[in-house]
Amino acid sequence: MSYAIVRNEKLTRAEVNGKGTHNDRKAKNHTNKDINPTKTHLNYYIKKNELTYTKEFDKYLKANNLKGHLRSNSIIMCQMIFTSDQTFFDKIGEKETKRYFDECYKFICNYKNLGEKNIISAVVHLDEGVPHMHLMFVP
C-alpha cells in the first residue's frame, strides 16, 4: 500500500538560494547523484518563479507592504516536498502522476487559507529516482 509523503522545511535567507539552484536545475554539476541530466527536460513547473527565490521574497514583501527588520536567522520561506513511492507512480502512469501533483498544489493553495499568492514556485522533478514536487512558499 502506498502513502502520500509530504515534508516541510523552514528556510532562512542564506538557505533559500541553494534550494533555488537545485529546484531550477541551474548548476552544471549536480551534487545530487540521483539527478539524471538526460531526463531533466521532463521536469515542469506548476508555478514558475521569475526571479531567484530571495528576489521573489523581497518582491513579495514590497507588494504586500510588509516592513521591518528581519534577523539573519529569520525563516523567510518554507519548502514542501510531495511524493510517494515508485510503485505508486508506476501503477498510476504519467497522466495520473501529473494530476496527483496538480491536486497537491490545489490542496496547499486552499490549506488554512495559505493561498496561491504566497506560493513562490512549484516544480515537479521527473529526473530523479522518484517523481516529486518542490513547493516554495512564504509562511
For each predicted feature, which ranges?
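N-terminal nicking endonuclease/strand-transfer module with a His-rich metal-binding environment
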Residues: 1-139
